[in-house]
Amino acid sequence: MPHSYDYDAIVIGSGPGGEGAAMGLVKQGARVAVIERYQNVGGGCTHWGTIPSKALRHAVSRIIEFNQNPLYSDHSRLLRSSFADILNHADNVINQQTRMRQGFYERNHCEILQGNARFVDEHTLVLDCPDGSVETLTAEKFVIACGSRPYHPTDVDFTHPRIYDSDSILSMHHEPRHVLIYGAGVIGCEYASIFRGMDVKVDLINTRDRLLAFLDQEMSDSLSYHFWNSGVVIRHNEEYEKIEGCDDGVIMHLKSGKKLKADCLLYANGRTGNTDSLALQNIGLETDSRGQLKVNSMYQTAQPHVYAVGDVIGYPSLASAAYDQGRIAAQALVKGEATAHLIEDIPTGIYTIPEISSVGKTEQQLTAMKVPYEVGRAQFKHLARAQIVGMNVGTLKILFHRETKEILGIHCFGERAAEIIHIGQAIMEQKGGGNTIEYFVNTTFNYPTMAEAYRVAALNGLNRLF
């Protein structure tokens, strides 16, 4: 006689990964419950990560645009906003996103349970509810989508009012004039842009020898130059020895012997999976040192009835990929296998000011692979649309095979880069000879548009062939 469970599947976490899994499961007729630790759905992406930081970035970039536009501004009338004012804009966006996502679950009759989950045995969870009560839930299968949080080294006092991580920075109430950012990854670079855009002095401490080393080197160099030009001080190959919190700021002692002082510190060096409270040892699962789980191509853990998606499995740690992972895991969970798979070339969007976005191979990778590629470039300053809106900083670079004309990689630096990249991505994904740089020469673009950069870059690249 088959065992009777409360649910076919329980999803732990309501971020993009959990939402993708839950929606995929209910659409296939499964009885599903989603457990969310906090009062509102959406996870770290909606409340502390992607959404608030991008809303912040947008507000700051519009202020910069206004102040740099000679039509609207003069030296006696600069537009200024406090950090608190800009955070209010982010709060409005978060509330809209939360209401929308809550509606998804309600429309699809997907039960949301609030509390902290922990495993008792292979098919049983205990839920510690906010009112102090404890519920026991059973399910045939589970999806762990509990996300990640900023990594906290034990020798840094994050309770100090001037020491922030990428979550707590969103509750900053004072107006810093000088910020130290430790960690020059995506989050560190994005916040360096935001603070510098608000006229705050920024020291960016990079533990490596260049910014965002996974990017094409020209894109990384462009960001470094732009930071240098705007006044961000970057210190490469540095690690902290000691961090001291004072009444009026923070002092950082570096292993190289340097000392830095600023009004506050944003520690943005690494993230760790939210798995420590799940009691995974009770179901025979182990995490790595970063609290992450290993999974196979169908997102199954070492326990075949337990799946994991999103930040908790590490790379690529993108909201966009997490949603797709959840959808694929839901298919595998119900049908035993998944016909869908994550695409090979996942686009990267980095929301610095200006943006950076890329898809496919870098020049360095193609050179190492000995692929005979050629480069096509378009500078934004030569596009009519960019001239009209004053977006002169930026470039689009297309890498293509010089013999087959196949597009191998696209890299964009400049405003709207994360939108522009998808035009090229759509052509790269075409099968049966459809992936060719000649498409951009043979198609008609609206004029004037930023998309026209593809035609300019394609002509530039094809003109290099002989």
UniProtKB/Swiss-Prot annotation:
Its EC number is 1.6.1.1. GO terms for cellular component: cytosol. Gene3D superfamilies: 3.30.390.30, FAD/NAD(P)-binding domain. SUPFAM superfamilies: FAD/NAD(P)-binding domain, FAD/NAD-linked reductases, dimerisation (C-terminal) domain. It is found in: Cytoplasm. It is an enzyme of class 1 (oxidoreductase). Binds 1 FAD per subunit. Conversion of NADPH, generated by peripheral catabolic pathways, to NADH, which can enter the respiratory chain for energy generation. Belongs to the class-I pyridine nucleotide-disulfide oxidoreductase family. This is Soluble pyridine nucleotide transhydrogenase.
